[in-house]
Amino acid sequence: MLSVLNRKMLTLVSHCADMLELCFDDADAVNDTPYILHVQSSFAIWDEQTVLFENRDFYTMQSGENDSGAGQPFAEKLASLNQKLNGCCVAKAVVDRDWLCIGLDNGVQIEIDTDEEEKNDETWRFFKLDDTSPHLIAYRHRFEWIH
């Protein structure tokens, strides 16, 4: 299923709490439904030998904090990452039972490690953003389709 990512364009890197969200879309389709990758395990986004963003960069707000985002190091890092990656196309997507690696056409690598999580903890979820497509869910050493 992840082969559908080949030549898709990365259009957004965002987050929800401590979950990374990557959105992929066709570069030349007008009304295409995007694919979403939710990452809940260890990950790193690399450019050569430099880590651009990783799971340790996430900041979870405490109750009572304002979510203005502007001027916050986390928000600035995410905005900078979007500037660098927005519009890059997937050159390759490789998955095995312990990790997922997505290589972009600008040389940036997105590496997701599934081997660190507990056996039944969801590590990542890949799906088309519609109401009918199944979700591919990765757990430690196994995959599952959810309809």
Segments (PLM) and residue ranges:
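Surface-exposed, interaction-prone regions used to assemble/regulate multi-protein complexes
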Residues: 1-147
